[in-house]
Amino acid sequence: MKNSKLFFRFLFLFFFFCLESSRGQDNGKTQVNIGVVSDVGTSYPDVAMLCINMSLADFYSSRPQFQTRLVVNVGDSKNDVVGAATAAIDLIKNKQVKAILGPWTSMQAHFLIEIGQKSRVPVVSYSATSPSLTSLRSPYFFRATYEDSSQVHAIKAIIKLFGWREVVPVYIDNTFGEGIMPRLTDSLQDINVRIPYRSVIPLNATDQDISVELLKMMNMPTRVFIVHMSSSLASTVFIKAKELGLMKPGYVWILTNGVMDGLRSINETGIEAMEGVLGIKTYIPKSKDLETFRSRWKRRFPQMELNVYGLWAYDATTALAMAIEDAGINNMTFSNVDTGKNVSELDGLGLSQFGPKLLQTVSTVQFKGLAGDFHFVSGQLQPSVFEIVNMIGTGERSIGFWTEGNGLVKKLDQEPRSIGTLSTWPDHLKHIIWPGEAVSVPKGWEIPTNGKKLRIGVPKRIGFTDLVKVTRDPITNSTVVKGFCIDFFEAVIQAMPYDVSYEFFPFEKPNGEPAGNHNDLVHQVYLGQFDAVVGDTTILANRSSFVDFTLPFMKSGVGLIVPLKDEVKRDKFSFLKPLSIELWLTTLVFFFLVGISVWTLEHRVNSDFRGPANYQASTIFWFAFSTMVFAPRERVLSFGARSLVVTWYFVLLVLTQSYTASLASLLTSQQLNPTITSMSSLLHRGETVGYQRTSFILGKLNETGFPQSSLVPFDTAEECDELLKKGPKNGGVAAAFLGTPYVRLFLGQYCNTYKMVEEPFNVDGFGFVFPIGSPLVADVSRAILKVAESPKAVELEHAWFKKKEQSCPDPVTNPDSNPTVTAIQLGVGSFWFLFLVVFVVCVLALGKFTFCFLWKTKGKDLWKEFLKRDTDSYINDIEKCLCSQEMPENSNKATNQTNYGMELRVRNIVQVNQTDPDCL
C-alpha cells in the first residue's frame, strides 16, 4: 500500500514537471540540461521539486527574450548517500547536465561535491546546511541556504541574556548534527559557558535509546539544552521528554533552525510536547512576491505545506537560470576521456567545458528572491537576521529577532540608540512561556531532586570560634555549625540563581578533635570526600593546584602582634613641661613689664606704691606675681593702670587654665608604643614568636628563616595573650603571627595591651573551596559579589565583629589600634595675640602718662618730679573721700570738713582743666 502511494505521488510530480517545463519551452531556444538530485517521494524534497518547476515557469514567462531554457532531469537518491552519488553520476554521464540542484542532506552533499569538483559541474544545494561542507573548499559547490553555524551567535546571545552558565547540546549522530558543534563550543566559551556533557542521539535511535539518554540528562544539574537534529527525530525526543518529566518548570530547551524550519512536518502530538521551548527560526522578510506565491501555492497544492526549503529551491533555480543565460550558449560540451585505459566510472565522467564559465556567473548573480536577498559570498548565502519564537500550544509565537548589528531586539525597526540602554531580558524579548507553563525565567542549573545534597566540610576550630564554631546539640545529638563564615555562605546561597541543597560535615575525629589542618581539609575535596569546604580557608597558590577557589569573601593577610609599653616619663620637673621655655620666659617678662608699668602709673598718686626704694621694689614684684593667684592688697586707682591690670588678669586666666589642662593630661595620659616594629627585627634578635596552629603561617615562617625551635603554636586568644605576657625570657614569646581576621578578634578583646605593627605576608583572603571544574565556582563568586555589595555584608560584620570592638576601634582599618591622648606642650604661638593686646594696652597707658607728665613739668627736674607725689591729681581728692568713709572714728570730722573737701575738689578740677583738659 505504501509503495503504491509513493508510485502515484511520483507519477503526479512527473506529469507536473512535464507540464510546467513545456510551458517554458519556446521553439528556437537553446535547451540546457540541469539535474536535480532529491529523495523523491518524501514530503520536503517533493515541495522543493515543485518549487523548482514553478520557478522555471515564472522565470521564463517573465523573460521570453532569454535564449536559454533549462530542462530539469530528476535523479532519485532514494534517501541514501550512495544513491545520491549514483544519481549524480548518471545525470552527468548520460544527460550531460551543466549543473546539479541538491542533494537534500549534508551527508549526500559530501559525495556530490567531490563529483562536481571532478567533472567541473557546479552543485547548488538548497538544503545541505552542515558547516563541515565548507571545509571541502570546492569552488564548484554553492550553498543556497544558511549554514548551521550562522545561528550560533543568536543562541549565544540568548544564553548570555539569561545568564545561564552551563548547557548540554543534544544532536543527531551524523554530519548534520556534528557540523555545528565546533562553532557552538567556541561561541559558548567566549561567554564562559561550560558544556559538561554532549547528548548524541543515534540516527536510527529507538524509543528505548532516547529514554536512556534523557534519563542521563535528567540526573544532571544542568537544565539548559540545545537541540540540533531533524524535525522528525526531535518530535520523538520531546514526546519522550514530556513523559519522563523533562518539560516541567525549571527546564530550558532551545531548538536550532534545523528543527524549527521543518516544524510543519511534525504531528500535533509532537508539537504539543514542545510547549515552552525557544526556537531559532530562519527569517523570511515579507514581500508582495512572496504573498502572491503563497496564494498560488495554496490554490494548486492545498494538501502540501510550503516551507523555507521550497523558497530556497525556488531562488536557487532562478539564480541558476540567470547564471546560465549570462554564461552564453558556447562550448556546452564535455571532454571525452580515453575509455581504453583502465579508469573508474568517476574518472570517466569527463570534464564540462561550460563549467568554468558557469562558475563565474553563478558567483556573481544577485537579485531579490522570495526568501530575501540572494547573493553568494564565499559560495554561500549570508544571513543577517534570525527570528526567535516561543512554542505555545500547537503553534509558535514570535518573541523577537537577532540581528548581526543590534543583537536581540523585540522589533526589527528598533532604533540602535535605544538598544544600548537595554539591561534586562524583557527589554530585548517579548513575554515568554517556559516549559510547564512557567512565567519566571528558569535558573538553568539545580541539584536534581533525585540527586544527593552537597557534602560541605567545615573546619573544627578550638579557638577564634567567631568565624566557624562546631557544636553538638545535646538533645537531638545533631551537629550545629555557626559563625561569620557560615552565615556569609548561607547568604551567598540565597543570592544564587538556583537552589542548592547542602549539608555541613565537621572535619573531626570520632572523639570530636580536629582531624587535621586546613591543608588536610582542602585535600579532602580533591579526594572526593567533600563536595566543598566552607570556613576560614585562605586562598593559596599551592592549594589552587588541585582545587578551585571562589572569589574571596573576606580580606585576609598575616598580622604581626606585639605588646605595648608606656613611654611617658614622669619626674620632679614634670610641672614645667606643659609650657615651653619660650612661653615661660615670655610670661616672666610680662610679669615684670606689667608690675613696672603699674608702679609707674600709680606711684605718684597712690600711697600703696610709695615709700622707701626697697619697699617700692618689693611692691613691684609682689603686685606682679600676686595677680596670678589672688587679688593683691594694693589698690589700683588710675584709669590706665586699671585697664592694664584687667587685661593682664584675662591673659593670666587663659594661661593658667591652659596650663592646668595640659599638666593634667601629662600626668594621666599614656603613650603606648610597640616593643617591636617589624619582623626583620625579630629575626635579627632571634626572638621566640608564636603562630596559629593548623594554619599556613608555619610554612611562611619557615620559608622566611625562623628556626623551628623559636616557633611556639597556640590555638586560642587566651593562649596567645598568656604567651605574650610571659615574654621570651619566661617561656613566652616576643610577638605573635595571626591572620588579619583573627587580629580583629584578638585586639577587640585586648585592645589596650597589644598592637598590629606589620602585615609581613599578603594572601588573597578567605574563599570557598570546590573541586576543579565545578560549575558552582563562577555562580558562587558572582553571588559573593552581590552579597558583598549589599547591606547584608555590613550586617553580618557587625553581628560577629563589632560586639568585640565596641570599646576598641577596628585594628585593621585603623593602623593605630590603641590611640592615646598625648599631652601637647604649649608655646608662645598659642598666646601671642593675648600678649600683644597686653603690650598695646601697656604702651597706650604709659604713653598717655608720659605725655601728661611732660606737659605739667615743663622746665622742671623730671626725675625729681617723677619721684614726687602728684598733689594736683584728682585722685588725691578721691582717695581722701574714700579714706574718710573708711574711718568711722573720724566721722564727725569728716562731716565738718565736707563742704571744705567739696570746695577743694572742685577747685583742683577747675585748675586741672585750665592747665590741660586731656589730663583728666
From Swiss-Prot:
Residues modified by carbohydrate are 53, 204, 267, 331, 342, 477, 542, 702
Q: Which residues form the signal peptide?
A: 1-24
The SS bond pairs are none
What's a single GO CC term here?
Answer: plasma membrane
Q: Does the keyword Iron feature in the UniProt annotation?
A: no
Identify the residue ranges that face the Extracellular compartment according to the record. Answer: 25-580, 657-830
InterPro entries xrefs = ANF_lig-bd_rcpt, GABAb_receptor_plant_PBP1, Glu/Gly-bd, Ionotropic_Glu_rcpt, Iontro_rcpt_C, Iontropic_Glu_rcpt_pln, Peripla_BP_I
UniProt GO molecular function: calcium channel activity; glutamate receptor activity; ligand-gated monoatomic ion channel activity
Any one Pfam family match given in the protein's UniProt record, by short name: ANF_receptor
- Keyword set, alphabetical order: Glycoprotein, Ion channel, Ion transport, Ligand-gated ion channel, Membrane, Receptor, Signal, Transmembrane, Transmembrane helix, Transport
The topology of this chain with respect to the membrane is: Multi-pass membrane protein
Q: Which GO terms describe its biological process?
A: calcium ion transport; calcium-mediated signaling; cellular response to amino acid stimulus
Q: Does the keyword Mitochondrion apply?
A: no
Parts of the chain on the Cytoplasmic side:
602-610, 632-635, 852-920
Q: Where are the transmembrane segments?
A: 581-601, 611-631, 636-656, 831-851
Tissue specificity comment? Expressed predominantly in roots.
Alphabetical list of SMART domains matching this protein: PBPe (SM00079)
Where it mainly occurs, coarsely classed, is membrane
The UniProt function text for this chain reads: Glutamate-gated receptor that probably acts as a non-selective cation channel. May be involved in light-signal transduction and calcium homeostasis via the regulation of calcium influx into cells.
Question: Quaternary arrangement and interactors, per the entry?
Answer: May form heteromers.
Which family is annotated?
Belongs to the glutamate-gated ion channel (TC 1.A.10.1) family.
Q: What is this protein called?
A: Glutamate receptor 2.2
What gene name is listed for this protein? GLR2.2
